[in-house]
Amino acid sequence: MIEIPNLEQLGLTQNEWFDVCQLAKNREIESPVLLDVQRTASSLNRWDVVYSLSLLAGLETSVLIDSEDNISIDWGDPGRVILKAPHGFMAPFKLWVHTHPGFTAYWSSTDTNSLALGSTIIENALVLGAPGIKKSRNSEFCVLEENNNKISQFGPLNQWTDEEIIGWKQWYQSLQDNTVMEKIV
């Protein structure tokens, strides 16, 4: 089991989290319980949970969130997650998240092909890896600062920022800060 803070935010007890971890370790990735936890975690931006389950299963996970906050979850072997057509989903997609379990967070050639193909329908993308979270924002959907690094200087990847990895420790600190602010407001 991987220790996850603030399980109550997910509506889970330690025992329930242990059971979900067992499902992931056993690669029971179509389990409604596991998928429900992933959807809840995704809706709360709890990428630590999504990454941990992916790491335990030894499989990559892809999360797609549409313009109406519908969430689609797909699983696959490293380097190959076949996305199921999310019926009834509305573009543009707010976010595409995928994992590199046990490896660094980087934009692989498969990832950059997906970003290039999705450059007119995906607003933001994250890759979750062992050191943390790597984010990219699509300039077609937001105003960026002047000196942002891009994934490429040419073609559709020129629309996508190439941002530094945010380490898990730093990410947890921002999660804790946001939780404190929510309690104040």
Please provide the spans of the model-predicted regions.
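Conserved beta-strand-loop surface patch within small alpha/beta domains used
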Residues: 1-95, 102-185
